[in-house]
Amino acid sequence: PIEDNELLEALNQGALLVRNPSARLAWSEVDEDLLLFASGNSRLLSGHLRELLRNICAADALHVENLQPWLSDDEGRKLLCELIKQGSLEFADE
């Protein structure tokens, strides 16, 4: 599993996160929260991650510039690490 500091270090060194071609990602609003569906798993997230989920679900590749607002957010970093761990996101060189 990837840790927060490893994620930040890799992205700051120019690594690119890409969606696994077989990953299925979608999200829905639930009151003020968000429900993320990722490769057969679901997770309830706070509403402030709405734009991050839009980026993750819509983009094939995520640059550090696209992720910067959420890299300083504990929940945002944790989500990215979990999506890498489950194989929905991966580094482009893998």
Q: What spans do the regions from the language model cover?
A:
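Short acidic, hydrophobic short linear motifs in intrinsically disordered regions
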Residues: L52-L71
